[in-house]
A protein has these predicted regions:
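Domain-level recognition of nuclease-like catalytic cores that cleave nucleotide substrates
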Residues: 52, 504-527
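Conserved lysine of the Walker
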Residues: 123
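Hydrophobic positions on the alpha1 helix immediately C-terminal to the Walker A/P-loop
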Residues: 126
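Accessory nucleic acid-recognition modules appended to NTPase machines
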Residues: 285-460
């Protein structure tokens, strides 16, 4: 017999409802429980559940009650029968990421995984797909309570079904050592996931310069905490690439390529300005999709660049530095070069050290991701340039910094080509991660340059020239690749697995008969 009580408990669905299901609800029965009161439930429409549901697992604060039943918030129940109003609501669409499998593999081999990357790139959403329970440190309703627990009884915050996701963990840096110690105690893999948009903050100090113990990170986490860098979506992840050409397959057999691409110049310009931000990808209207990059840029210069290390920085100067960085995408511009560019576009006096501090802060919040130099064994003693190549982590940051839209890029093909290179490098990095690889850049004293070298852990590598399209540019890229390949001393290292000109536009991929160079439109590439 159920006795009515005046109380209401929030219940939410597990994220397994088909995105095609429309919001609807149906009344099963009206009754109340003496402890639970009135209850509303969201359930999978395909699950066959009785009117009375016997949850078999104790639940609190969002942990699961049963494998395919419900989640319940702010209440603790065990072996109670619940009934009430069942509803089905449309869940947010989740586009699969290349990093899904990478994260799964890391959870099987490490006690904890740190997921890093820029704000808005989908770190929390990625981790939530594999999380057993979630702690959101940025939740304003619980922030004060969570911070207090982090200082006094952090083990309570670590308790929960594994893998336990701790979102925005850097708000309380004590989590780093606590997770490391807990992993040691449990001696099991796949216990925790940590997500955040910045590197761990520097320890806070008191008025005498002493590190405050609560904020101090003592250990690196080596051997216990694995790292995963998540970038904005590649074209394959956003479903803008057909995926007919697999980068991984090219390392096994590059004799033939086949497929097609549906990206023309107008579409490429839009994709470059939109970027790979998940919210922008999911938005149906182009204007709304393009706004995401500008919102991100404004947030970086007005707030994020200051919060990363609690240093007050000038918003306008941050804008000018990022604009200069955008103009130097794909180059080895020094800090001095960027400084000179800023001075040419303004009157303010500043030093190399000032520019460097801003660039360093932008790297710490994953806005900038430069490409390091590749140093192969060559037949001749050619001096290799070791300067990093300048890139933002996503091309839309460059277009937002310069205030450009798709039409502006088409009207300035030189700038378009430079920023497209950033898009191509972003995608290559995403795909290389799935292959245990990294992307480098090559340039020697004779200015022989290769835009991207995809180098795998096993020593295999591929040489890539990035061109927006056109016969002349493709021919020039192929000549560069064959020249560099001939310089490599194959007695000391492997021959390249493939030579590829990665283009922005083109209807289909093909292999050139005269030199074996692959020509692959980016709209056909995948991991």
């Amino acid at each position: 017999m159920f006795n009515p009580v005046k109380c209401f408990y929030r219940v939410r669905a597990r994220p397994q409802i088909s995105p095609n299901d429309q919001t609807k609800s149906r009344q099963i029965t009206k009754c109340q429980h003496p402890r639970l009161g009135k209850a509303s439930f969201f359930r999978d429409p395909y699950a066959k559940l009785p009117n009375r549901i016997p949850p078999t697992v104790e639940s609190k604060n969002g942990q699961l009650l049963n494998q395919n039943l419900i989640e319940i918030l702010d209440i603790q129940i065990k072996n109670q029968y619940i009934c009430g109003k069942f509803s089905v609501r449309k869940m947010k669409e989740y586009k699969k990421r290349v990093a899904d499998q990478i994260l799964s593999d890391k959870l099987e081999s490490s006690g904890a995984v740190l997921i890093e990357g820029p704000k808005y790139c989908g770190k929390t959403t990625l981790a939530s797909q594999q999380a057993g329970s979630i702690l959101s440190m940025a939740d304003p309703e619980r922030l004060s309570q969570n911070l207090a627990l982090a200082r006094t009884n952090i083990s309570r915050l670590l308790a929960g079904k594994t893998p336990r996701l701790i979102d925005e963990w850097q708000i309380a840096p004590q989590f780093w050592d606590a997770v490391r110690n807990e992993v040691d105690k449990r001696d099991e893999d796949g216990q925790f996931m940590l997500t955040g948009s910045a590197v761990p903050p520097k320890p806070k100090k008191d008025e005498y310069g002493n590190i405050i113990e609560e904020e101090k990170i003592y250990h690196t986490g080596t051997g216990r905490i694995s790292r995963l860098k998540l970038r904005p979506m590649s074209l394959w992840e956003s479903e803008d690439s057909t995926g007919d050409v697999s980068l991984g397959h090219l390392f096994e057999n590059a004799d033939t390529v086949d497929g097609e691409s549906h990206i023309d110049l107008d579409r490429l310009a839009f994709l470059t300005c939109r970027g790979g931000w998940p919210k922008a990808v999911l938005r149906k209207k182009e204007k709304a999709s393009l706004a995401q990059a500008f919102d991100y840029f404004d947030s970086v210069v007005s707030t994020d660049i200051k919060r990363v290390d609690d240093v007050e920085r000038d918003e306008e100067l941050a804008r000018r530095i990022m604009r200069s960085y955008a103009r130097n995408q794909g180059s080895q511009a020094t800090v001095g070069t960027i400084l000179a560019d800023i001075k040419n576009n303004g009157d303010e006096q500043m030093s190399d050290a000032t520019v460097y501090s801003y660039i360093k802060a932008l790297k710490e919040i994953f806005v900038i991701e430069d490409s390091t130099a590749w140093n192969p064994n060559l037949r001749s003693k050619t001096a290799i340039r070791t300067s990093d190549t300048r890139y933002f982590i996503d091309p839309s940051i460059a277009t937002a910094a310069l205030g450009l839209g798709p039409k502006d890029l088409i009207n300035d093909m030189e700038t378009f080509g430079l920023i497209f290179e950033t898009l191509a490098v972003r995608d290559l990095r995403v795909y290389a991660d799935a292959l245990d690889g990294k992307v480098y850049h090559y340039r020697d004293k004779n200015n022989l340059e290769c835009d991207a070298v995809v180098h795998l852990r096993n020593g295999s590598y591929g040489l890539v020239e990035i061109k927006i399209g056109g016969t002349d540019l493709i021919n020039a890229g192929a000549d560069t690749l064959t020249t560099l390949a001939e310089k490599i001393d194959s007695t000391k290292m492997k021959r390249p697995s493939f030579l590829m000109v990665l283009t922005g536009i083109g209807d289909y991929p093909y292999r050139r008969t005269e030199d074996g160079v692959l020509v692959v439109p980016i709209g056909s590439l995948r991991d």
